[in-house]
Amino acid sequence: PDFHTATMPLGDDPDGETDIYATVVRYSPTDAHRLHNRPAMLFVHGMSDYFFHRHVAEFFYQCGWAVYAIDLRKCGRSWRPGQRWHHTTDVAQYFEELTSALAYLSEMHNTVVIQGHSTGGLVVALWLDHLRNSAPELHAHIAGAVLNSPWLDMMVPKPVSETLKPVLRWAGARWPNVSMPAGNLTAYGKSVSAEHYGEWVIDPEMKPL
């Protein structure tokens, strides 16, 4: 009852799947009518993720923030039948819903801080750079950005990364929907999930471990 959602229709999917949507989540306790007097914080999740962090929303609300989050297209609450979970061929596609969400927040809040986690940190950094050139009047509402464990580089030594970049660009342009082998990446998910070793209740369909 303390969380409300608003769905943003985004129209046709540039990757050819069903119509896409994004979802803005707002933490709205009983005194939420006073939210417009607060600065806003917008959380942007990472890859294969969604917003479920009640304790984070409660903490920042108690610190004086109006707390929002966005589930990006095909992620979490924004997924629709006929779509591959979390699939995009270009992270710049996320700029559309982030700009729309910021426009919505700027109608109620003079100040907005963006918090991006993991791949969300990469997306936020790229989006804000794009926004300052494409919509400076909206960018003016941004007071800062917090990048939480941002994925800004590959998890391999620099010489390996530089060698692989042209190969991956070539392969990605020709086979954009082919998945790369990733090995076992379950350690982090299990470490935070209450069903394994952590404390958080996570929907395994929205956030596969």
Question: Which role does the model predict for each range below?
Answer:
Residues 1-35:
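N-terminal cap/lid segment of alpha/beta-hydrolase-fold proteins
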Residues 119, 123-209:
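Alpha/beta-hydrolase-fold enzymes
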